[in-house]
UniProtKB/Swiss-Prot annotation:
Domain notes: The HMA-like (RATX1) domain is responsible for the specific recognition of AVR effectors.
Organism: Oryza sativa subsp. japonica (Rice)
One GO process term, biological-process aspect: defense response to bacterium
Family, as annotated: Belongs to the disease resistance NB-LRR family.
Subunit comment: Interacts with AVR-Pik through its N-terminal part containing the HMA-like domain.
Keyword ATP-binding: yes
Molecular-function annotations in GO: ADP binding; ATP binding; metal ion binding
Alphabetized SUPFAM superfamilies for the sequence: P-loop containing nucleoside triphosphate hydrolases, RNI-like
PROSITE patterns: HMA_2
Renumbered residue ranges of the record's region Structured coiled coil (CC) domain: 1-190
Residue ranges constituting the HMA domain according to the UniProt record: 189-258
Protein name: Disease resistance protein Pik-1
Length: 1143
């Protein structure tokens, strides 16, 4: 809340940040403000601070219908004043010393404050927030009675089947399918797919003949596993009329797809294919219907309520009105549930008892009564529109679980509630209400138009405005109904000559809040909008810059939020983006295993544009925009989005004032974007030209010459630029530079002059190195060079003291400079898909904040804590330089990234190096490779290390005698890994008292039945065996060792002990597989791709080559085990040793 109070918002504008900026200006003794100007500034600051102190708790902290407050005349004036004051301060700061001495920057603003704020503020009261009554709420979400239930039959049948038969879908979540737009492409080849049940040759002949005789059809083919799909290729085909004709001829037809022939339709087909896990049918006692506002949640719930009602002893349908907290309407809802359950009356509200209890006591009384009444009954409970999880928790407590076949249906528009229901209760199935298919959507829209008598004036083919409505509505039933009704009204008003203007739908989109026939749709959308806190509304309104055909790039949007001043930190902005997904405003497509993309429903975007226009927050100009209205608007354009089809020449030819525009976003194929008059944008702070293929080097140079010095964000991603011009150095206040996916091959030296740069993103470029001048970017907190040919980072990155995120993913980098240990604020280091296997040990200094992403996993590797500071303070400066050669932090090995990085001694050694013993006794983990034995004094040193929790011992050669671990020392050790040809080790009584994990990595060797003694490891929980695929687990030495450990595990007092043995992913039970031969016979499936195997090979350290004995007695001749380890790829299967308890 505190951070949000200081941000730019749609309601209060730049009021909070500009007050901070004005205070800093007044406190700066070197700003050379004249006495009169200082007095003006102090007056403005005093008056606006009083307004801010009133608005902050009342607007920022509340939900509800704040439109009255935010559109109030005084607040609107303060909002515009804040933007102008922000510009005035920046204008003054750009002046030189002499100009400042004669400037009077705040005189006019002071007069405005006196006239329009001060004189009105004393009697001004904040308009009261209000929520619509429950009757309005319920009306908004339902279609009119005469609209028909087009497309609801299939949903009803699916849901009834779930309730009556259960589900075989192990995910318990039926996902909504991405919408496939219905496109009419005059003159272009189309591919149209129909589904037609053709039971015999006669029906097939009828269908094929009809399709073949249709105008525009070039070819017809039969497809589908059941040969029930007709694929049509042609141009100018009226698919809706063809579907109608097919239904008359053969009884049924469904439109599956309309696309251009040149498109690859495999991607769409793959997206639409349902993915299910086959399992046993399980009972579904509760269905959570999830969907967008206007998607038909309430309608289908009512259909189910009436269709199934006779099967239940009692039934309830209760709707919940939205509120800022769950408490106001909850008692009323509980009373409604009890009344309906008792009396079976759907619209009666009654109090179930005559007591005088209030508050929680009354709620609890209702819960107890409902639960007691329903306990022995078969019930159907429908709870419509859950807004708060706390509401559902209370209602759920009142509904008892029994075995009488009771069913619960709930609806919500919030993803977060559906996900929590799904996680908390195995009996819940989440059913996402999808869009109506294009055929049903066209039928619904056309039916409303023809019912009104306007069907003959709407047009046919590509002139049929119903096609545009279907594309805009994305199959949302409520939007289809009311927009089709509005279209009829517009046609009546405009007449046939204006019908092409209707086709653009721009005037209808812009009138969602004003056209009377669209009021029910607007009310439904307002419910969700008003439920958002102000900071989320601000971020959401900014999304109105997009056209409904644009996909949203998450990182791009998040960083523009930061540049606009809505949010200060990227992590915070990412969290807000997630909130908008959870609340259903932004839709995510894809999953964790595929490319994710995001979009906002077109109807929601139209609604947001209208809201944005009310606040003068952002202006969108695109195809069909009324340019004369935009030019004549009395309010200045603060933020501008130019969308596909808008002629940029209009900007210079009209009287549109963009001198106070702070943000310009250019989306899509804007005609001649290089012709945008950037010199007119005198106060521009955000410029996004991403994916404009018309922008090249010469254009960028001219743009930089024209740009305002105040530009904070410059987005050039996806343009055709090859280099950054020297003129960029003038952008002294640039904070975010986004040049990914361009053709640039180097960063100019002038990059070091951008002292305020916070984010530098050069991903997917041809850059091969970072310039030394990067050390000058002291404010940089994000450096992203992923997918570039960069092979080395300069030591100067250690000078970036404020760096928080560094991404070198999928580059040629093999080793990171030791200077990264100086990056005390680093939080995320992404080295996935690189040859980086180790970090300098100095990186442990930042272990408390750093998360390392390594290998091909998204799970972070934590660095060992609490030792590096002690090490650095205890090691003399002269010795410290040598430590890099004897110690590093391993973040990945042959088996993927560990959960916690391990201090590793590089190379092979005859003994533990003296430097380790002298200076690194306090380590919490250690990984070291010895030649063939562990000397007694070395074991004593390891046993006495006070903090040692993880130990990895690797042996080049098979030890001649078993390594004996006695009951002395290793008091803190929890994880012990032995890497040897065979695990020649024996644990004596009371050895390693806190050891929980024992892991063996072995290859081959002579068979031995010697005891290992794991029964002496009193805290042991798991034993892991990993063996090379070159030596299968039926090799004599390996199988004998496994048998020994299995036998000892069965005798362990902590049984069952879990054994993990590399054998693919097949789970092996000791009851059915009593010998090692059976274990060896298990599948050894290798699921890791060849590239991943190659990437996981250890990096070669050049400084160790050809040096004989390398460091402190390292052995250069022992390399067999190392070689085998480098080639090892294995998989693990779970074996749980279950033994019968004997008395």
């Amino acid at each position: 809340m505190e951070a949000a109070a200081m941000a730019v918002t749609a309601a209060t504008g730049a009021l909070a940040p500009v007050l901070v900026k004005l205070a800093a200006l007044l406190d700066d003794g070197e700003c050379n403000l004249l006495e009169g100007s200082r007095s003006d500034a102090e007056f403005i600051r005093s008056e606006l601070e009083a307004v801010h102190s009133l608005l902050t708790p009342n607007i920022l902290g509340r939900m509800g219908d704040d439109d009255a407050a935010c559109k109030d005349g005084l607040i609107a004036e303060v909002r515009e004043l804040s933007y102008d004051l922000d510009d005035a301060v920046d204008d003054f700061l750009e002046l030189n010393f002499e100009q400042r001495r004669s400037a009077s920057p705040f005189g006019e603003l002071k007069a405005r404050v006196e006239e329009r704020v001060s004189n009105r503020f004393s009697d001004w009261k904040l308009p009261a927030a209000s929520l619509p009554p429950s009757s309005v709420h319920r009306r908004a979400g339902l279609p009119p009675p005469d609209a028909g239930l087009v497309g609801m039959h299939k949903r009803k049948e699916e849901l009834i089947e779930l309730l009556e038969q259960g589900s075989s879908d192990a995910s318990r979540w039926r996902k909504r399918k991405p919408h496939v737009p219905l496109r009419i492409m005059g003159g272009e080849m189309q591919k149209i797919v129909f589904k037609i049940p053709m039971v015999d040759d006669k029906s097939r002949t009828k269908a094929m003949s009809l399709v073949a005789s249709t105008v525009g059809v070039h070819s017809v083919a039969i497809a589908g596993d059941l040969r029930d799909e007709v694929v049509v290729v042609g141009d100018g085909i009226d698919s809706i009329n063809l579907v109608s004709a097919l239904r008359k001829k053969v009884g049924h037809a469904e439109l599956l797809q309309v696309s251009q022939v040149k498109e690859d339709v495999k991607e769409i087909t793959a997206m639409l294919a349902p993915v299910k896990s086959i399992c046993e049918f399980h009972e579904v006692k509760t269905i959570c219907i999830l969907g967008l506002p206007g998607g038909g949640k309430t309608t289908i719930a009512r259909v189910l309520y009436h269709a199934l009602g006779t099967q239940f002893q009692c039934r309830v349908f209760a709707s919940i009105s939205p509120s800022s907290s769950p408490s106001p309407n909850l008692t009323e809802t509980l009373a409604d549930i009890f009344a309906q359950a008792q009396l079976g009356v759907t619209d009666t509200l009654s109090t179930p008892y005559g007591g005088s209890g209030t508050g929680r006591a009354l709620q609890q009384h209702l819960i107890d009564n409902i639960s007691a009444f329903l306990l022995n009954k078969k019930y159907l409970i429908v709870i419509d529109d859950i807004w708060h999880w706390e509401e559902w928790e209370v209602i759920r407590k009142s509904i008892p679980k029994n075995d009488l076949g009771g069913r619960i249906i709930m609806t919500t528009r919030l993803n977060s509630i559906a996900e929590k229901c799904h996680t908390d209760d195995n009996d819940v199935f989440v059913y996402e209400v999808g869009d109506l298919d294009n055929n049903d959507a066209l039928s619904l829209s056309w039916g409303i138009a023809t019912k009104s008598g306007a069907g003959n004036r709407i047009g046919t083919g590509e002139d049929n405005s119903c096609y545009d409505i279907v594309n805009m509505c994305y199959g949302m039933p409520l939007a289809l109904i009311w927009l089709s009704s509005a279209l009829v009204g517009e046609i009546e008003e405009l007449g046939g000559a204006e019908v092409k203007k209707c086709r653009d739908l721009r005037h209808i989109e812009d009138g969602i809040l004003d056209i009377p026939s669209l009021q029910p749709l607007a009310e439904s959308l307002c419910l969700g909008y008003n439920h958002l806190p102000l900071y989320l509304r601000t971020l959401l309104l900014y999304c109105s810059a997009y056209h409904w055909s644009n996909r949203i790039e998450r990182g791009r949007l998040v960083r523009r939020w930061i540049a606009e001043g809505f949010v200060s930190e990227e992590k915070e902005a990412e969290g807000y983006f997630g909130e908008l997904i959870n609340r259903g405003w932004i839709t995510q497509h894809g999953d964790n295993n595929s490319y994710n993309y995001y979009e906002i429903h077109p109807v929601m975007l139209a609604f947001l544009r209208c809201k944005s226009k009310e606040y003068n927050f952002l202006t969108c100009l695109g195809l069909g925009s009324d340019t004369s209205t935009s030019a004549s608007s009395p309010r200045l354009i603060r933020r501008l989005s130019l969308q596909g089809g808008y002629p940029v020449d209009c900007l210079s030819s009209m009287s549109m004032d963009v001198s106070h525009t702070c943000s310009l976003v250019v989306l899509g194929d804007v005609a001649r974007p290089k012709g945008i008059p950037f010199y007119m944008f005198k106060r521009l702070r955000v410029l996004d030209l991403e994916d404009n293929k018309d922008i090249q080097d010469s254009h960028l140079q001219g743009i930089c010459e024209q740009l305002s010095l105040r530009v904070r964000y410059l987005g050039l991603k996806g343009t055709r630029i090859r280099k950054l011009p020297q003129e960029m150095r003038k952008l002294k206040h640039l904070e975010i530079l986004y040049v990914g996916s361009t053709r640039i091959s180097e960063l100019p030296q002038e990059i070091g002059e951008l002292k305020h740069l916070r984010i530098l993103d050069v991903r997917n470029t041809d850059i091969t190195e970072l310039p030394l001048q990067i050390r000058e970017l002291q404010h940089l907190h994000t450096l992203d060079v992923r997918n570039t040919p960069i092979s080395e980072l300069p030591p100067q990155v250690g000078k970036l003291q404020n760096l928080k995120i560094m991404c070198v993913r999928s580059t040629g980098v093999r080793e990171l400079p030791k200077e990264i240990g100086e990056l005390n604020h680093l939080q995320t280091l992404d080295v996935r898909n690189t040859r980086v296997r180790e970090l300098p040990w100095q990186a442990g200094q930042i272990s408390q904040s750093l998360r390392v992403l390594a290998g091909d996993s998204g799970d972070g590797v934590r660095l060992p804590e609490g030792v590096c500071e002690a090490l650095i303070n205890g090691i003399p400066g002269a010795t410290r330089a040598k430590c890099r050669e004897v110690l590093s932090i391993a973040i990945i090995d042959r088996f993927g990234p560990p959960l916690v990085g391990i201090f590793k001694v590089p190379g092979s050694h005859m003994r533990i190096p003296k430097m380790i013993k002298d200076h690194f006794r306090v380590l919490s983990c250690l990984d070291i490779r010895l030649c063939h034995k562990l000397e007694d004094d070395d074991q004593k040193f390891l046993a006495e290390m006070p903090n040692l929790q993880t130990l990895v011992l690797r042996f080049e050669a098979l030890p001649r005698q078993p390594i004996t671990i006695n009951g002395t020392g290793f008091q803190m050790l929890e994880s012990f890994r032995v890497d040897s040809r065979l695990p020649r080790i024996a644990f004596h009584e009371d050895a390693m008292p806190n050891l929980k994990l024992l892991e063996f990595k072995f290859y081959a060797g002579p068979a031995s039945n010697d005891a290992i003694g794991i029964t002496n490891l009193k805290s042991l929980q798991k034993v892991v065996f990993r063996c090379s695929p070159w030596y299968k687990s039926d090799a004599p030495g390996i199988s004998a060792t496994i048998d020994v450990v299995k036998k000892e595990a069965e005798e362990h007092p902590n049984r069952p002990i879990t054994l993990l043995i590399n054998a693919g992913y097949k789970e092996i039970s000791t009851e059915s597989h009593g010998s090692s031969e059976n274990i060896a016979g298990s599948s050894g499936i290798d699921t890791e791709p060849a590239q991943a195997q190659h990437d996981n090979l250890p990096a070669v350290r050049d400084d160790y080559k050809g040096k004989g004995i390398l460091l402190d007695g390292r052995c250069p001749t022992c390399g067999r085990a190392t070689k085998i380890e480098e080639e090892t790829q294995d998989r693990v299967a779970d074996i749980e040793i279950q033994t019968e308890t004997t008395s």
